[in-house]
């Protein structure tokens, strides 16, 4: 009787399970099952002592890596718009600053806090939302935080005093930091390392286009309808993006998806299923996740010269961009006497430069692919830097050009065109340095990116606060030259790391540990049994490429790196391709936006 009842229940489950997964089901059901998923021969016996190990099936419809290119690029564009919206919200506020000053009877330095504290909120992103997304998934964190961003934007429109407005702006920035932090992770979840370069190049334009478009939209809207309409528009725009992303963007984070699948399989079958990733890595508590996320970025920032110098360079450039939101109105409204809306149009010059940079980065990706092939899949991190060499020179050229052509006697187009080399250089510097840091710190990449983001956000928050005073005391020419001199002082950094990067990395503790990890991975792959036939699939681990040095000359730092798991376990999680090439290509699978707590577990313990 019990057997018949069990068979009936199993039959009902089978009938209720979709054989193909419709897209809406991917969005609303992270652990969606099909009969094929249930019948898959998972390793194990389904007991507490020997649970079934849940892994992706071949061509698994729920695995983001196997989705169609159309779906991947559609989602890439969607998350890019979500980051563009946040960046636009950060700067569009400047379009209503004059009206805010007049209504609340405050000075420009207090009104500017609406921008500064919003950007300061960005520093919270990698410290708070990144570990939460690794615990609960990217989808739920995005949905909740973007809803809060929309609410705080809408609340700003009804603020009755300046401090209410400023505090609401801070919370909007803090919650808006979530898509800025997690959107790159969504792209890394879907694209293999070789495909990720172009996707990230196109995606990277969004966080820069937003701040440039913001003053233009805010300027005209503030001039014609008032600052409350600016805030109202930002609330409506972010709300529309929130609705679109909530409806169309599914969960993409593999550890969470496999965990949900294991939970649902256990519930449906009565057997014990556990995600293979959780078995290999272990479940991380929320306390441990925050401990790592809050401490490790600071250790890397202040102990690693590579991280500190390149993060400082990016922070100066980022701060300069936000400084221009106060500088352009001074130059074009105060000196050239343009109205509030028209004086925001010069930001289009920066946007043109950004578009050229994105085009150039797509073209340069072909060069990088060739270098990667030449090194057998282990292109050195320094191969990422050639575009940065050009860009580092373009930035001070654009800034000095702007500083000394903003005389009223010189035609306005000359001054506006100065924004093009600055925008061109800014995007390429950011892309080149971010990729270099990821490649040089593979297993520490998430923490390095967090350190970079925090320092960058602090500079972006501080620079606008002293801009007005600087222009009043120094005049428009010398004040505009200050960031140009700072950028000029940073020009040697990319050249230094391009020429001596390999040597410097050996002398940096955590860069050396990362390199030692990659050597061990390469060595274990060499020692692994060769495929029995030519058609056997071999793995390509998704990582950012790093050099494959002579493994016979392993530094002492290797002793601090934990033994890699058995290479056959890695194969079970790796993406595969046919072994048709003559040279083995090995890549680290880790997502650069995820904190590696397995291979770095002992790296930050006190000695």
From Swiss-Prot:
Task: Please report the record's description of how this protein sits within the membrane.
Answer: Multi-pass membrane protein
| UniProt xrefs under InterPro entries | MFS, MFS_dom, MFS_trans_sf
Q: Which residues cross the membrane?
A: 77-97, 110-130, 139-159, 170-190, 202-222, 229-249, 305-325, 342-362, 385-405, 413-433, 443-463, 478-498
Q: Which family does it belong to?
A: Belongs to the major facilitator superfamily. DHA1 family. Polyamines/proton antiporter (TC 2.A.1.2.16) subfamily.
What is the originating organism of this protein? Aspergillus fumigatus (strain ATCC MYA-4609 / CBS 101355 / FGSC A1100 / Af293) (Neosartorya fumigata)
Question: What lineage, starting at the top, does this entry show?
Answer: Eukaryota, Fungi, Dikarya, Ascomycota, Pezizomycotina
* Coiled coil spans: none
Low complexity: compositionally biased ranges: 572-583
What is the induction comment? Answer: Expression is up-regulated by exposure to human monocyte-derived immature dendritic cells. Expression is increased in clinical azole-resistant isolates.
Task of the protein: MFS transporter involved in the basal level of azole susceptibility. Confers resistance to voriconazole and, to a lesser extent, to fluconazole.
- Which GO molecular-function terms appear in the entry? transmembrane transporter activity
The encoding gene is mdrA
Q: What is its main location?
A: membrane
Q: Which Pfam families match?
A: MFS_1
Query: What protein name is recorded for this chain?
Result: Major facilitator superfamily multidrug transporter mdrA
Keywords from UniProt, A to Z, are: Cell membrane, Membrane, Transmembrane, Transmembrane helix, Transport
SUPFAM superfamilies attached to this UniProt entry: MFS general substrate transporter
């Amino acid at each position: 009787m019990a057997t018949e009842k069990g068979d009936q229940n199993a039959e009902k489950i089978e009938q209720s399970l979709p054989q193909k997964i419709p897209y809406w089901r991917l969005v609303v059901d992270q652990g969606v099952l099909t009969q094929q998923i249930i019948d898959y021969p998972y390793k194990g016996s389904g007991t507490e002592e020997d649970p079934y190990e849940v892994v992706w099936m071949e061509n698994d419809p729920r695995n983001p890596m196997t989705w169609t290119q159309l779906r991947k690029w559609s989602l890439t564009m969607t998350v890019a718009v979500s980051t563009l919206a946040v960046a636009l919200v950060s700067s569009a506020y400047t379009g209503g600053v004059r009206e805010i000053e007049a209504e609340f009877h405050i000075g420009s330095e207090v009104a500017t806090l609406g921008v500064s504290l919003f950007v300061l909120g960005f520093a919270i992103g990698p410290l708070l939302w990144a570990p939460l997304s690794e615990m609960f998934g990217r989808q739920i964190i995005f949905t909740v935080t973007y809803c809060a961003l929309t609410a705080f934007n809408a609340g700003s429109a009804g603020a009755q005093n300046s401090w209410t407005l400023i505090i609401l702006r801070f919370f909007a920035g803090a919650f808006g930091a979530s898509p800025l932090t997690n959107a790159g992770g969504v792209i890394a979840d879907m694209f293999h390392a070789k495909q990720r370069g172009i996707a990230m190049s196109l995606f990277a334009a969004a966080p820069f286009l937003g701040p440039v478009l913001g003053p233009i939209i805010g300027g005209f809207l503030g001039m014609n309808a008032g600052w409350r309409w600016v805030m109202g528009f930002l609330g409506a725009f972010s709300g529309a993006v929130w609705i679109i992303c909530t409806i169309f963007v599914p969960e993409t984070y593999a550890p969470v998806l496999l965990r949900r699948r294991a939970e649902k399989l256990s519930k449906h079958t009565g057997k014990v299923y556990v995600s293979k990733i959780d078995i290999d890595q272990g479940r991380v508590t929320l306390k441990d996740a925050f401990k790592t996320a809050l401490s490790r970025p600071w250790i890397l920032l202040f102990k690693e010269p590579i991280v500190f110098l390149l993060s400082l360079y990016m922070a100066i450039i980022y701060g300069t961009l936000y400084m221009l939101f106060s500088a352009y109105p001074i130059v074009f409204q105060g000196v050239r006497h343009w109205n509030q809306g028209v004086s925001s149009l010069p930001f289009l010059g920066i946007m043109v430069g950004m578009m050229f940079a994105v085009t150039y980065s797509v073209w340069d990706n072909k060069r990088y692919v060739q270098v990667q092939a030449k090194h057998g899949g282990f292109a050195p991190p320094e191969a990422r830097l050639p575009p940065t060499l050009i860009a580092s020179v373009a930035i001070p050229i654009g800034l000095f050009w702007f500083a000394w052509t903003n005389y009223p006697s010189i035609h306005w187009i000359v001054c506006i065109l100065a924004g093009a080399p600055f925008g061109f250089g800014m995007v390429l510097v950011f892309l080149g340095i971010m990729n270099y840091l990821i490649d040089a710190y593979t297993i520490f990449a998430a923490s390095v990116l967090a350190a970079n983001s925090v320092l960058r956000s602090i500079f972006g928050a501080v620079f606008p606060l002293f801009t007005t005073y600087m222009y009043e005391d120094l005049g428009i020419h010398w004040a505009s030259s200050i960031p140009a001199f700072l950028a000029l002082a940073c020009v040697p950094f990319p050249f230094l790391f391009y020429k001596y990067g390999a040597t410097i990395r050996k002398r940096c503790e955590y860069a050396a540990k990362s390199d030692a990890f990659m050597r061990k991975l390469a060595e274990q792959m060499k020692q692994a049994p060769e495929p029995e036939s030519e058609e056997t699939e071999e793995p390509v681990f998704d990582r950012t490429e790093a050099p494959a040095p002579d493994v016979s000359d392993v530094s002492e730092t290797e002793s601090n790196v934990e033994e890699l798991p058995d290479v056959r376990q890695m194969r079970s999680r790796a993406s595969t391709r046919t072994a048709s090439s003559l040279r083995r290509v090995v890549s680290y699978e880790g997502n650069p936006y995820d904190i590696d707590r397995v291979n770095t577990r002992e790296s930050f313990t006190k000695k």
